[in-house]
Amino acid sequence: MSNTLFDDIFQVSEVDPGRYNKVCRIEAASTTQDQCKLTLDINVELFPVAAQDSLTVTIASSLNLEDTPANDSSATRSWRPPQAGDRSLADDYDYVMYGTAYKFEEVSKDLIAVYYSFGGLLMRLEGNYRNLNNLKQENAYLLIRR
């Protein structure tokens, strides 16, 4: 699927409830890539997470199941509520957020970090630039399932 920009499985190593009532910051490491790490603010009232949980994390440019045409820019698309019986990528996941990539940072020679904001809930994804090269400074969907 060309709508999928990033997809990996992460093992949660730490859950920090911090000072917010319904939000925790989780730290997770990829089970398939040595240097890929995830830090994510998550609403634990909607999606409870514990240490040692295994999560599939996907970043997608669209929730359409079929590939989006290359000339289909965000200016020409319109949002409409899904019709009864319509399926989307979100149907296969337990927790979905929509946000924007706002910062890219070079961590070391081969590592970069990409920062996203999902309405104030933040995410930092660090990994090899070859694995994160599809991520651009644009809006995207974050999809998570157990």
Curated annotation (Swiss-Prot):
Entry's Gene Ontology BP terms: nucleolar large rRNA transcription by RNA polymerase I; ribosome biogenesis; RNA-templated transcription; termination of RNA polymerase I transcription; termination of RNA polymerase III transcription; transcription by RNA polymerase I; transcription by RNA polymerase II; transcription by RNA polymerase III
UniProt entry keywords in alphabetical sequence: Acetylation, DNA-binding, DNA-directed RNA polymerase, Nucleus, Phosphoprotein, Ribosome biogenesis, Transcription
Keyword Acetylation included in the entry's annotation: yes
Chain segments carrying region Non-specific ssDNA binding: 16-39
Phosphothreonine: residues carrying this PTM: T68
GO cellular component: nucleoplasm; nucleus; RNA polymerase I complex; RNA polymerase II, core complex; RNA polymerase III complex
Domain of life of the native organism: Eukaryota
UniProt GO molecular function: DNA binding; DNA-directed RNA polymerase activity
Database matches in InterPro entries: NA-bd_OB-fold (IPR012340), RPABC3 (IPR005570)
SUPFAM superfamilies named in the record: Nucleic acid-binding proteins
Protein's UniProt keywords contain Nucleus: yes
List of residues that carry N-acetylserine: S2
Localisation per UniProt entry: Nucleus
Further remarks about this protein from its record: Present with 6210 molecules/cell in log phase SD medium.
Function: DNA-dependent RNA polymerases catalyze the transcription. of DNA into RNA using the four ribonucleoside triphosphates as substrates. Common component of RNA polymerases I, II and III which synthesize ribosomal RNA precursors, mRNA precursors and many functional non-coding RNAs, and small RNAs, such as 5S rRNA and tRNAs, respectively.
Protein family according to the UniProt entry: Belongs to the eukaryotic RPB8 RNA polymerase subunit family.
Subunit structure: Component of the RNA polymerase I (Pol I), RNA polymerase II (Pol II) and RNA polymerase III (Pol III) complexes. Component of the RNA polymerase I (Pol I) complex consisting of 14 subunits: RPA135, RPA190, RPC40, RPA14, RPB5, RPO26, RPA43, RPB8, RPA12, RPB10, RPC19, RPC10, RPA49 and RPA34. The complex is composed of a horseshoe-shaped core containing ten subunits (RPA135, RPA190, RPB5, RPO26, RPB8, RPB10, RPC10, RPA12, RPC19 and RPC40) where RPA135 and RPA190 form the DNA-binding cleft.
Name recorded for this polypeptide: DNA-directed RNA polymerases I, II, and III subunit RPABC3
Annotated source species: Saccharomyces cerevisiae (strain ATCC 204508 / S288c) (Baker's yeast)
